[in-house]
């Protein structure tokens, strides 16, 4: 029998789930992360390596609980905490140590950079028109601007920026990729065109090559490398789909896909989702 593996990179831990092709859940598992920390007021950071090690532990644990061999997993889907910033150089996926701790979704250091972002766009209204959102301190683009301004040595060495779950995707597949759900929370996506907003990226003076390829959530973004498969106890070349950020994925799972439906999620954060016609 074929099984599917879901991996969610949360704030407090990484959660895994195995289900069959009909969606029947066989088992779940969780591996905890160290609590977020930071050296400044309002800072919230984690070490991306901790996410990867938790992914390894939780994957082995869920296979054990489900009594499913890793070779029976036919596809992997990813979700995770949104908006975070992981800075990488060109080191390969087998190591892929981040250049600095990841700046998380609940980090509040970027008030000035949010102002810079709106100025670059032309106005708050224009930024909303371009990306679907105003500048928010938790979003990714202000974090990139903060690193450029305050840690120029790190920024100069940065060749790729990834969201948390997409760092795990890179460790699994060697592919720099994201998908439209998570990318919509970066302040850099043209949500109507479903691709990076090249105009805004240019106005910010950023190199578009920093950003990963953007897939749809259902598309295959890459396949497990031999190294990752060995670490995870899975089969090499297993496809990994785009997935989504944790909140959009949860909303779809709750059936918030038609007008008039609303969901509320209370976790490390509180989020209300409504379908917009």
List each language-model region with its residue ranges:
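N-terminal glycine/serine-rich phosphate-binding loop of ATP-dependent small-molecule kinases
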Residues: 1-98, 129, 157, 212-213, ...
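Gly/Ser/Thr-rich active-site cleft segment
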Residues: 9-11, 22, 102, 108, ...
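Short beta-strand scaffold segments in enzyme catalytic cores
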Residues: 14-18, 84-88, 187, 249-252, ...
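Acidic-glycine-rich active-site phosphate/pyrophosphate-binding loop
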Residues: 27-30, 34, 112, 217-231, ...
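Short acidic, glycine/serine/threonine-rich loops at helix termini
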Residues: 86-90, 172-176, 181, 224-227, ...
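A charged helix-plus-loop insertion that forms the helical arch/lid used to bind
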Residues: 93-109
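Catalytic phosphate/nucleotide-handling subdomain of diverse soluble enzymes
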Residues: 230, 234, 238-277
């Amino acid at each position: 029998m074929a099984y599917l593996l879901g991996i969610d990179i949360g704030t407090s831990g990484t959660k895994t789930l195995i289900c069959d092709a009909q969606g029947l859940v066989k088992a779940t598992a969780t591996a905890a992360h160290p609590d977020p920390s930071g050296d400044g007021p309002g800072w919230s950071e984690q070490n991306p390596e901790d996410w990867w090690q938790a992914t390894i532990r939780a994957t082995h644990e869920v296979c054990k609980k489900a009594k499913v061999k890793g070779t029976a997993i036919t596809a992997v889907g990813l979700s995770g905490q949104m908006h975070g910033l992981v800075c990488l150089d060109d080191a390969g996926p087998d190591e892929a140590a981040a250049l600095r701790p990841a700046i998380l979704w609940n980090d509040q250091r970027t008030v000035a950079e949010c102002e810079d972002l709106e100025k670059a766009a032309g106005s708050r209204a224009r930024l909303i028109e371009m990306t679907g959102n105003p500048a928010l301190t938790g979003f990714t683009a202000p974090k990139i601007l903060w690193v450029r301004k305050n840690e120029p040595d790190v920024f100069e060495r940065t060749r790729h920026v990834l969201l948390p779950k997409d760092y795990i995707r890179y460790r699994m597949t060697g592919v720099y990729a994201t998908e439209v759900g998570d990318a919509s929370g970066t302040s850099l996506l043209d949500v109507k065109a479903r691709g990076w907003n090249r105009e805004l990226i240019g106005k910010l003076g950023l190199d578009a090559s920093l950003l990963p390829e953007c897939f749809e959530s259902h598309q295959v973004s890459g396949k497990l490398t031999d190294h990752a498969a060995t670490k995870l106890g899975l089969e090499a070349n297993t496809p990994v789909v785009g997935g989504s950020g944790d909140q959009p994925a949860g909303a779809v799972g709750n059936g918030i896909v038609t007008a008039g439906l609303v969901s509320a999620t209370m976790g490390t954060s509180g989020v209300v989702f409504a379908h917009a016609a």
